[in-house]
Amino acid sequence: PTALTKVAALAAMLAGLIYIVIQFIHPADVVESLTTPMWTIVHVLSFAEAVLVMIGLAGIYLRQVREFRVLGLIAYAMFGFFFILQAAFNFAEAFIAPLIAVDAPQLAVDIVGLFGRYPAVNDLGPLAALPQVGAVLYVGGALLFGVSIIRARVLSRGAGILLIVAAVITPIAGALLPHALERMAAIPMGLGIIWLGLSLWMDQRKTTAN
């Protein structure tokens, strides 16, 4: 339906914008940050961004489900599951970590520092594998989703190319840059998501006009 497609397009554009903005205002992953208002604001925004991306991806996938075929389904599942994990983790960062920080500050820092590549002092069990699992889903999902966009020839191929570029840049930035600068690798990903949302919006308008 037209209305749902428009909602998905707007969700993708807003999510991409939030994803870019939070890279510039994210507090340091230290215990002193956990109880500040900015920490809560940033991670509530991150949670909202993850939910919005899931809505946007659903609309983007459904618009070209036939053209996406099996590869596109795999890409959608991987990329979408990453944002499910992100939403859960952001919720914990926003509302649980600040509570833990009072009685167990080191444990709180170990948890929120998972994606900052800070060595954990406490044994986090299976949670310690989350960054590696997330990296595979994020990079692999974005890469395959970009390839699927290009192959489908429904939405902007430029947006698909930008997703691929963002996926390639991410692990390189992680290997070469400090975490504060590594965050900037999210900018092309955010732009790619915005572009896809805009492309979906324009495609819907064109379809309606025809």
PLM feature segments, named:
Residues 1-210:
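Hydrophobic, aromatic-enriched alpha-helical segments typical of multi-pass transmembrane helices
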